[in-house]
């Protein structure tokens, strides 16, 4: 039996339990045990309301990194990256170490994180690097008849929609659609198919449908691999922003407002001297509550104390809903 203390967090209402492995004395846990705990704690029928996954925070042995983030989805699978989750981990570690910027180790890269100017309503806001960005098949296993998929119709997937695929570093399949397609069940059917046994994306893929709102704003809805539909997916919003900029030949560094069912973020991009692209995701890092559970064969709630931050965030959500309603 173990008593586990947590912080319930969210980025764009993509919610997680943040668990500090060192403070909870669970650094020796196996991946199997981490997965089992995630499956049980993240169940939406649990008294704590469940979550999209667990963010395990640990010490890093990489030079310059102040900590390590490991993401386990609600189904027990491991996510190589989570942009919304990283913002909350960035806040947790920066506050813990009394810093305003640092580096955090993720599965595929050591990424820059920093405190940022609030996007509104004094909501705690953080900026995190999203990289590496790759289009090559080695980073994005797919069998759709092309090595690089950019704005192309793949009849096996859909007769009309043009798709792009990119890894950041988890895999994303992206298409731009109108409201009629958004209102249909096309995304759910396609994403469910591509995240079950299929000949096109053997490891599954995050599937995003994107609607243009204006020159400086898009709306993104994502079916996440291992989770399903979520309020928002940070890496998806970053990837969709990049594809939009490439399609429109926009300046990479210009901030793009990205709206989603969970709120709003901003994304910028840059290309270094070698041609490699990195993205910057800017958005909320909200701490919803702190509490503890007892973990043995089941996970039992012991304590759970709410903060005032979620009420604060709802002001932004109402602003977003009004914007989406009036923009159409």
UniProtKB/Swiss-Prot annotation:
The record marks 172, 224 as: Could be important to modulate the pK values of the two catalytic cysteine residues. Disulfide bonds: none annotated. Its EC number is 5.1.1.7. The active site is at 82 (proton donor), 233 (proton acceptor). One of its GO terms (cellular component) is cytosol. PROSITE patterns: DAP_EPIMERASE (PS01326). The keyword Zinc does not apply. Pathway: Amino-acid biosynthesis; L-lysine biosynthesis via DAP pathway; DL-2,6-diaminopimelate from LL-2,6-diaminopimelate: step 1/1. One of its GO terms (molecular function) is diaminopimelate epimerase activity. It is found in: Cytoplasm. Homodimer. Catalyzes the stereoinversion of LL-2,6-diaminopimelate (L,L-DAP) to meso-diaminopimelate (meso-DAP), a precursor of L-lysine and an essential component of the bacterial peptidoglycan. Belongs to the diaminopimelate epimerase family. This is Diaminopimelate epimerase. It comes from Listeria welshimeri serovar 6b (strain ATCC 35897 / DSM 20650 / CCUG 15529 / CIP 8149 / NCTC 11857 / SLCC 5334 / V8). The gene is dapF.
């Amino acid at each position: 039996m173990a008593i586990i203390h947590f912080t319930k967090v969210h980025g764009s209402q993509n919610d997680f339990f943040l668990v500090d492995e060192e403070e909870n004395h669970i650094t020796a846990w196996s991946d199997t045990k981490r997965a089992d705990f995630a499956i049980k704690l993240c169940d939406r029928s649990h008294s704590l309301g469940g979550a999209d996954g667990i963010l395990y925070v640990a010490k890093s042995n990489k030079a310059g990194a102040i900590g390590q983030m490991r993401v386990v989805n609600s189904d027990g699978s491991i996510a190589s990256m989570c942009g919304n989750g990283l913002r909350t981990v960035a806040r947790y570690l920066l506050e813990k170490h009394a810093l305003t910027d640092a580096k955090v180790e993720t599965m595929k890269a050591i990424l820059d994180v920093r405190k940022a100017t609030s996007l509104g309503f004094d909501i705690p806001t953080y900026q995190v690097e999203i990289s590496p960005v790759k289009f090559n098949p080695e980073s994005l296993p797919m069998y759709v008849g092309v090595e690089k998929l950019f704005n192309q119709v793949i009849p096996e997937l859909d007769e009309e929609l043009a798709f792009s695929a990119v890894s950041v570093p988890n895999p994303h399949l992206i298409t731009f659609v109108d409201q009629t397609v958004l209102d249909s069940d096309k995304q759910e059917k396609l994403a469910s198919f591509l995240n079950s046994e299929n000949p096109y994306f053997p490891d599954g893929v995050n599937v995003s449908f994107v609607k243009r709102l204006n020159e400086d704003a898009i709306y993104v809805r994502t079916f996440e691999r291992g989770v399903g539909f979520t309020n928002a997916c940070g890496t998806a919003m970053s990837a969709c922003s990049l594809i939009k900029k490439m399609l429109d030949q926009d300046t990479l560094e210009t901030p793009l407002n990205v709206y989603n069912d969970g709120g709003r973020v901003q994304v910028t991009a840059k290309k270094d001297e070698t041609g490699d692209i990195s993205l910057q995701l800017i958005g909320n890092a909200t701490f919803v509550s702190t509490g503890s559970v007892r973990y043995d064969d089941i996970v039992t709630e012991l304590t759970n104390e709410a903060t005032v931050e979620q009420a604060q965030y709802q002001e932004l959500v109402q602003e977003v809903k009004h914007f989406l309603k009036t923009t159409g």
